[in-house]
């Protein structure tokens, strides 16, 4: 199968496209946080896509962005590390949300094309200039397109001379039907993370079985975090509709993607399946938080297959 890589203008940015001859494609903007603009299989878009540069910059619902150095919400936007308190800007109610990686200007390190796949590798180096996270690190993201499949590998290397707290995540919105009500969902064995009125964890978890088997979403509203409890190396989420079957997966294990956020936005046209290496507010509650030593790398993979 023939794969190719092309580059085109996209407003003030460039959009890079990896595609093959059967209509599989991933399209991203490295200069805007390596945000995924669209993902297609056999010509069918399965992502809530960005159609214009203006829509990308508006960034409604944080569609398809990478999340670092923490995913999800941070209580009051503050945390304490090695006796010093740091303050992020408040940008979600009384909390900070999703870190600061969404629009950083990444560099394309390399593009690799083979008979079986196309991969683009983007990186961004932080020299410690962020007031709330004054640590040096290198973030990397590899996106690989294969035959009816797409894989992401994130990496975060501590370039500083002290240990630093790290959490990673991704925020894709999938579209599998005109209405989310008509999608069938199956989730991995997991616990429901109980939250308070500020959408922050209470410290309690409950067993969750609503989508143990393929079940129509219907009128269910979801904006919930889950701790994946199954003992295996991979967790799987299935989305099925008249358009086909989307099989999402994420690596499990120590320092991998043991948490998952599932969100159905109010417009009810898509569903977000969000891998996280740590819990909501992990900089404060420490759940799943990785303290990365100098030169240590946190990495992990997730992806989708379509049939």
Task: Name these PLM-found stretches.
Residues 1-86, 90, 232-254, 298-306:
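Beta-strand-rich N-terminal accessory domains
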Residues 2, 86-88, 163-165, 173-250:
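Active-site/ligand-binding surface loops and adjacent short beta/alpha elements
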Residues 2-10, 89-146:
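Extended, loop-rich substrate-binding clefts of extracytoplasmic carbohydrate-active enzymes
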Residues 30, 128-166, 170-172, 177:
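Acidic, contiguous internal or C-terminal segments within carbohydrate-active enzymes
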Residues 80-84, 109-120, 144-149, 177-182, ...:
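A short, structured loop/turn motif at beta-sheet edges
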Residues 96-111, 216-288:
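Acidic/His-leaning functional-site neighborhoods
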Residues 141, 149-151, 296-307:
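C-terminal or internal capping secondary-structure element at the end of a domain, subdomain, or sheet
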Residues 288-297:
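Intrinsically disordered, low-complexity Pro/Gly/Ser/Thr-rich segments with frequent PxxP/GP/PP motifs
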